[in-house]
Amino acid sequence: MRRRTAEKRNIVPDPIYGDILLSKFINRLMYDGKKSLAQQIVYSALERLAEATKENPIEAFHKAIDNVKPVVEVRSRRVGGSTYQVPFEVPENRATSLAIRWIVTSAQSKKGRDMVSKLSQELIDAYNNTGPSVKKKEDVHRMAEANRAFAHFRW
């Protein structure tokens, strides 16, 4: 049997911009507890994003995240001995965390020297609705669209 659901932890906003989403992004990028290094990388990438977009860095960052957020995704559902990929709507908090994860992993998988340039390029691509993280979102949407016939298994 399931126990009670875990309580949501309140996340401290980041020190410079006072933004909770940016704090989540920094925490996702952090390796081995090196938060100050992750903050330096993210803040430098945001400066480059602001230069490229000629916009407030936080607004540009939020727009980049919104462009990567998925609306629907598929989940495996076993019905009568066969497994179907059933499309489900994605809750807001899961959509945000998926978008952050996709941006960070696609920036990490880029070939290049420093993480600042890779991350800033990925954020610029996400802002302009291009790049691997947006492609990942479109692939997820395409899978959900292809399996729309199984949407009635969504009980």
UniProtKB/Swiss-Prot annotation:
The keyword rRNA-binding applies. GO terms for molecular function: rRNA binding; structural constituent of ribosome; tRNA binding. GO terms for cellular component: small ribosomal subunit. Pfam families: Ribosomal_S7. The keyword RNA-binding applies. InterPro entries: Ribosomal_uS7 (IPR000235), Ribosomal_uS7_bac/org-type (IPR005717), Ribosomal_uS7_CS (IPR020606), Ribosomal_uS7_dom (IPR023798), Ribosomal_uS7_dom_sf (IPR036823). SUPFAM superfamilies: Ribosomal protein S7. Keywords: Ribonucleoprotein, Ribosomal protein, RNA-binding, rRNA-binding, tRNA-binding. One of its GO terms (biological process) is translation. One of the primary rRNA binding proteins, it binds directly to 16S rRNA where it nucleates assembly of the head domain of the 30S subunit. Is located at the subunit interface close to the decoding center, probably blocks exit of the E-site tRNA. Belongs to the universal ribosomal protein uS7 family. Part of the 30S ribosomal subunit. Contacts proteins S9 and S11. This is Small ribosomal subunit protein uS7. It comes from Petrotoga mobilis (strain DSM 10674 / SJ95). The gene is rpsG.
